[in-house]
Amino acid sequence: MSEILKSPIQSPLLRGFVTSRRCDASEIEDLGSNVTKGLRVAGGRRVLRSHFFSYCLTYPAVNVAATTETGSGDGATEKCVYLCGNSLGLQPKRTQTRVNQYLSTWGTQGVQGHFKPLEESPLPTWLDADDRAAQLIAPIVGASKAEVAVMQTLTANLHLLMSAFYKPDINGKHKIILESKAFPSDHFAVETQLRHHNLDPATSMITLTSPSSPEDNILTTAEILSAITTHAATTALILLPGIQYYTGQLLDIPTITAHARTHSVFLIWDLAHAVGNAPLHLHDWGVDAAAWCSYKYLNGGPGCIGGLFVHERNSAVPPPVGELEVQQKEGEWEREGYANRLAGWWGNDKRTRFAMVNRFRPVPGAAGFQLSNPSILDITSLTASLEVFAEAGGVGALRGKSLRLTAFLEELLVGEGSSIVGVEERALFRVITPSDPGQRGAQLSLMLRGGLLEAVMRELEKRAVIVDERKPDVIRVAPAPLYNSFEDCVRFVVAFGEALAVARKEVAV
């Protein structure tokens, strides 16, 4: 952590602030401003908050600072702190512009919008909209454009990938490995895939629990590799998260991927919490396949369209379905690298897509896994945010600031020199996210003592602080580098300490 917390943070202002629990709004603002300026000099990225709408900029909350310092308690509005990008990202301001441009195309062009762009509009035709989005998402996941497709939603894409690449043999490889505390939708997807193949999850599903961390289930790389080795002979597929949704742990994707390939086990990564958060190099790492959503760090909007990655070695294009009679050589149809998949017309070659011929020739690459024409409204919303990422220099450029933000937040919460959160309140929570910056993204997960969650969340909301809760006892705090600042981190920690103090008295722990 010392390498991340450079000297600009170790300022007299910070040292004076964190050793005193009494502060006012101007002190908080000064601290956040000075730290931010210092980090810019040290090579940090500029806050891009101006590109985003601020959630509840004047949230109607109790003015706690006024109540504490002056006793006025006049109910004045408080600037809202939004540290919830791991659940739903903020809306980029250009989203409204792009959506209005899409509506203008629809309103004035009708069906011709599929093929004819509106004059002076930057939007592509609807036929090419998904292609443009793929071009923008490819560098974010570290892939070629041909290896990514913008389509469907996360769980649907996981099912589509499993339908193509999970080929169980009850007498050989038939098991699926996943973590014991996987996001429920991933768990449901695996269970139903097994049942779809008339397999019993009790005997064909392996769930990983960390022997060294059974409560939090922080799986070490060694534990995962050992499980793969142990079950390789009977395992057909592995599903793992790039970043674990509950703990915020970033797994060692390249090492685990390489080990699975050594044992000829197909591995799918759920990148819901990794995409737009941590640098990814899916092609270079040799990842088999992956899927993600776009409403968290990618800021596409609630329920927005998802995406998937299929490595080029797994997406070869075969002869057209319906012309098998011309293939005389045995096995020529199953060309190396081709995976049969659930198909639809939008995955068909663009040159013949509208010819209405019942011969399926998939688009080369991941786009050949598409089914129906995608929602252009969704793609327009997503593309607006991806443009902001491109202007910011991509995830790699943002990672430096993200590391500093998260380390700063951790230091304020539990650092030896910080007493913003009182001694009694510190005993009421612990950080379950790995302290190693290389094993986490932007999220810190705080495990509260039992029974405190409801009261703490209520008190945070009163103080105009928005974070995410995961029952029974976890608060997830995610400073997103695109729009969050060091001041946001300070304001959260002050409010969190106060919320814990109220909850402690209320629950009597």
Swiss-Prot record:
Q: Which taxonomic lineage is given here?
A: Eukaryota, Fungi, Dikarya, Ascomycota, Pezizomycotina
Protein family per UniProt: Belongs to the kynureninase family.
Indicate the principal place this protein occupies in or around the cell. cytoplasm
Cofactor requirements of the protein: pyridoxal 5'-phosphate
Q: Which residues carry this modification: N6-(pyridoxal phosphate)lysine?
A: 296
PANTHER family reported for this sequence: KYNURENINASE
Q: What this chain does, per the record?
A: Catalyzes the cleavage of L-kynurenine (L-Kyn) and L-3-hydroxykynurenine (L-3OHKyn) into anthranilic acid (AA) and 3-hydroxyanthranilic acid (3-OHAA), respectively.
Native organism = Chaetomium globosum (strain ATCC 6205 / CBS 148.51 / DSM 1962 / NBRC 6347 / NRRL 1970)
Recorded protein name is: Kynureninase 1
Q: Which UniProt keywords apply?
A: Cytoplasm, Hydrolase, Pyridine nucleotide biosynthesis, Pyridoxal phosphate
Q: Which GO terms describe its cellular component?
A: cytoplasm
The catalytic activity, as recorded, is: L-kynurenine + H2O = anthranilate + L-alanine + H(+); 3-hydroxy-L-kynurenine + H2O = 3-hydroxyanthranilate + L-alanine + H(+)
Q: What is the top EC class of this enzyme, as a single word?
A: hydrolase
Q: Which GO BP annotation is one of this protein's?
A: 'de novo' NAD biosynthetic process from L-tryptophan
Molecular function, one GO term: pyridoxal phosphate binding
Keyword Glycoprotein appears in the UniProt entry: no
Compartment(s) where it occurs, according to its Swiss-Prot or TrEMBL record? Cytoplasm
